[in-house]
């Protein structure tokens, strides 16, 4: 079994028994979208590449440590705060796509892997960006921070000067000035 899709059910964490997923040694895709999960599922098999847990009620993430093939993680439309996210992704060197949009983060989470190419954090409550936060994401290409609480004072001058960045969405924030961006940027969204 390589794909397991359990979308649009009434699954709860208490009904998912022990190591049910880790026994599936060839599993590459696990989708449990639109359910009643309150925390991430696990343990998960090392073969997993794509994990989708969207439209749940997740407030807690376990560690994804050891999932060396995990490339895509979709966690949008949950109830995650930055503290729940910070430790979960440490050590993942293959993670390229992370969607944390439509959650309850007021700060950017720490500990995200430098391997990310796509990072979606739109529709949260993020109000500022720590200095040089995005500097370690050498290959970051797509960044969405629209529908947050970002204001000019919360964005250090060099925040978006990322040479690899091709798309940046800062729409629907509280910006009065246009932040500095790298000349390689192809798509820049600042709708109000």
Swiss-Prot record:
LRR repeats lie at residues 1-23, 26-46, 47-68, 69-90, 94-114, 115-136, 139-162, 164-185, 186-192. One of its GO terms (cellular component) is extracellular space. It is found in: Secreted, Extracellular space, Extracellular matrix. InterPro entries: Leu-rich_rpt, Leu-rich_rpt_typical-subtyp, LRR_dom_sf, SLRP. Pfam families: LRR_1, LRR_8. It comes from the Eukaryota. Sulfated on tyrosine residue(s). Contains keratan sulfate. Keywords: Extracellular matrix, Glycoprotein, Leucine-rich repeat, Proteoglycan, Repeat, Secreted, Sulfation. One of its GO terms (molecular function) is collagen binding. Its main location: secreted. Belongs to the small leucine-rich proteoglycan (SLRP) family. SLRP class II subfamily. Binds to laminin. This is Lumican.
């Amino acid at each position: 079994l390589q794909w397991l899709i359990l979308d649009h059910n009434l699954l709860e964490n208490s009904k998912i028994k022990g190591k049910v997923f880790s026994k599936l040694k060839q599993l590459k895709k696990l989708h449990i979208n639109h359910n009643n999960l309150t925390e991430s599922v696990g343990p998960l098999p090392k073969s997993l590449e794509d994990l989708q847990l969207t439209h749940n009620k997740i407030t807690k993430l376990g560690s994804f440590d050891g999932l060396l093939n995990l490339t895509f993680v979709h966690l949008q439309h949950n109830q995650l705060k930055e503290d729940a996210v910070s430790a979960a992704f440490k050590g993942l060197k293959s993670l390229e796509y992370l969607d944390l949009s439509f959650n309850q983060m007021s700060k950017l989470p720490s500990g995200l892997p430098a391997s990310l190419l796509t990072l979606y954090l739109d529709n949260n409550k993020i109000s500022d960006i720590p200095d040089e936060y995005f500097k370690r994401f050498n290959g970051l290409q797509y960044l969405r921070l629209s529908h947050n609480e970002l204001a000019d004072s919360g964005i250090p001058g060099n925040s978006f000067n990322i040479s690899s960045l091709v798309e940046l969405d800062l729409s629907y924030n509280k910006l009065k000035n246009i932040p500095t961006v790298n000349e390689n940027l192809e798509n820049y969204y600042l709708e109000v």
